[in-house]
Amino acid sequence: MDAAIGKVFDSVSDFFSGAASASADEFPLCDSDIISGCEKELAEAQDEGRKKECIMRLSWALVHSKMPSDIQRGIAMLEALVVNDTSAMKLREKLYLLALGYYRSGDFSRSRDCIERCLEVEPESGQAQALKKAIEDRIVKDGVIGVGIAVTAVGVVAGIAAAILRS
């Protein structure tokens, strides 16, 4: 019985700490060495085609970084790239990476917008569908936490009011 109660407390604790969603949020991470390599590769690129490939690799690495500043750099690069793209396949890839960047930076609304645009381009993309589910799960989780905080605040205020009225 104690073990069951312990599991319940652990799962509630994991839910509110974010650990419960870790499996849904497992996207590859990129370290600074890979980012540095991509930056070097871009600096050494001679022709435009090669530069575009290097920019895509660098933006991929940046949005997969552990560092929030890198993620923001990746988002900025991708936002600039999405505007000029006419190829559906490349647009899908850029929108996916942009959605992932927003997701990893905590901007779930923008992330959802980008992933929906991505799915308009390629509705059958399993990668995009998985990210959309992770986004929706996170939005629901944040909503539940927000409601929990609001209910707790109301309870505290009601408790204080009741204590004041009794005295």
Swiss-Prot record:
Domain of life: Eukaryota
Matching SUPFAM superfamilies: TPR-like
Disulphide bridges, residue numbers: none
Membrane topology label: Single-pass membrane protein
Repeat positions for TPR: 92-125
Note, other: Plants silencing FIS1B show reduced growth, increase in the size of mitochondria and decrease in the number of mitochondria per cell. Overexpression of FIS1B increases the fission of peroxisomes and mitochondria.
Function: Component of the peroxisomal and mitochondrial division machineries. Plays a role in promoting the fission of mitochondria and peroxisomes. In association with PEX11C, PEX11D, PEX11E and DRP3A, is involved in cell cycle-associated constitutive self-replication of preexisting peroxisomes.
Family stated for the protein in its record: Belongs to the FIS1 family.
Subunit structure: Interacts with PEX11A, PEX11B, PEX11C, PEX11D and PEX11E.
Protein name: Mitochondrial fission 1 protein B
